Amino acid sequence: MIRIGQINVLPALFQSVVIPTAVGEEMTCSSTPQIVRDWMAHPPAWFSIRAPHTTVNPTMLRHRGERDAISLAQEIHADALLLDEEKARAEALALGVAVIGTAGVLQRAADQGLIADLKAVHDLLRQAKFHVSEKILNESLARHLAFKQARRDQFRAD
């Protein structure tokens, strides 16, 4: 979200954003794009980093950040957990954690008028080499266009 200039949709959609320490470490390591490291150097008040008290079974997922994110979401009873990796999403859902992907967040933002051109933002994701399938992006865009059409139809009916 930072790399494509859309990080500010998060506080408009969610009261706060909490990430586990492991993800914070990933976002500040030297291999992370400079724009992300700069943002992490001065995060806004709606963003916080917290270590989970417990961790889900480490054999479930190889990636510590995903394990800790699922654990933290359970602990704080998060409304939604932002996860894109398919196996991690399946594991979170199996544990009763609601998930949303980056494409879903961007679609929700577009549905609420926070993003004027969802297709252009999808293009930014592609340019940033974000790992998301064309199928997911196309489905997200189709849902958004259907949402916009339904709103237009509703206004015409009124």
Show where each model-derived region lies.
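Active-site-proximal, substrate-binding regions of enzyme catalytic domains
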Residues: 1-80, 86, 90-98, 120, ...
